[in-house]
Every structure is written in C-alpha cells, then in structure tokens.
C-alpha cells in the first residue's frame, strides 16, 4: 500500500520515515511522528529515568528501554523495527534493551534513508 496524499504509510514496512541509532532502526508512518520522536526522545529518557528512580536507585542504563517505550507511544499505527539490520519483534527489541543496560551510554538517534536490501545484507554480516 503506497503512502497517502498526506504522506502517511499504513504499512510501516514500506515507510521511508526511518530513525536509527546504528543498532536499532525504527520505522514511522508519517514525518510528523518521526520528528516527534527525534525531538522528544532525550526529554523522555529523563522522565523515564526519574520514574524508575522513584521505585529503586539502579546503576543500569535505561535509555534504550525508554526509547522503545517512547516509540510505542509516538507511533500509533503499529510497530516495525530492525535490530542490526534484521527484522525484529517487539519482544526481541526489549530483550536487546535489557542486554545493553550495563553499557554506560546509549547512542543518539538520527534520521536515515531507508537502506536498500543490498546495504541491509552488508550490515547483517
């Protein structure tokens, strides 16, 4: 299904609105949602960490978990993500976020062009 006249993709797999942090890639149905995510993820990380600290003080880096939660809140038309160039389910992305909690920092997000199949295969090797 192609994009609508207003530039909205109902099938996220076809979307050209893409954000990546080099490990995880999120697809958005509209440019509005993409910009909303890119403009707000850092502030959301701060809010998310404050919520966690109210319950327990933890040495873990919760940024990726916050980013996944924020993506789910921003993108209303589904969930489509790649993990290191391969399709990933919601659960797989969460497991990845739990694995990297011990890393001291999380990469920042940036807008990218949707990789072509050949480039995607290179990143998987």
Swiss-Prot record:
Keyword DNA-binding: yes
Keyword set, alphabetical order: Activator, DNA-binding, Early protein, Repressor, Sigma factor, Transcription, Transcription regulation
Signal peptide (UniProt feature, chain positions): none
DNA-binding region (UniProt annotation): 77-96
Subunit annotation: Interacts with host RNA polymerase (via C-terminus). Interacts with DNA; binds to the A2b, A2c and A3 promoters.
Function: Mediates, together with protein p6, the early to late transcriptional switch by stabilizing the binding of host RNA polymerase (RNAP) to the late A3 promoter. Activates transcription from the late A3 promoter and represses the main early promoters A2b and A2c by modifying the topology of the sequences encompassing early promoters A2c and A2b and late promoter A3 in a hairpin. Binds to a region of the A3 promoter located between nucleotides -50 and -100 relative to the transcription start site, that presents a sequence-directed curvature.
Protein name (database record): Late genes activator p4
Taxonomic lineage of the native organism: Viruses, Duplodnaviria, Heunggongvirae, Uroviricota, Caudoviricetes
């Amino acid at each position: 299904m192609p994009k609508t006249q207003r530039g909205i993709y109902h099938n996220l797999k076809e979307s050209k609105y893409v954000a990546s942090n080099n490990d995880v890639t999120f697809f958005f149905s509209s440019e509005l949602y993409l910009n909303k995510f890119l403009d707000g993820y850092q502030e959301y990380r701060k809010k998310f960490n404050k919520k966690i600290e109210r319950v327990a003080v933890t040495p873990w880096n919760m940024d990726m978990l916050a980013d996944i939660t924020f993506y789910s809140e921003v993108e209303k038309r589904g969930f489509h993500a790649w993990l290191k160039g391969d399709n990933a389910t919601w659960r797989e992305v969460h497991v990845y976020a739990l694995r990297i909690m011990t890393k001291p920092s999380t990469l920042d997000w940036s807008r990218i062009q949707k990789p072509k199949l050949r480039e995607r295969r290179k990143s998987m090797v």
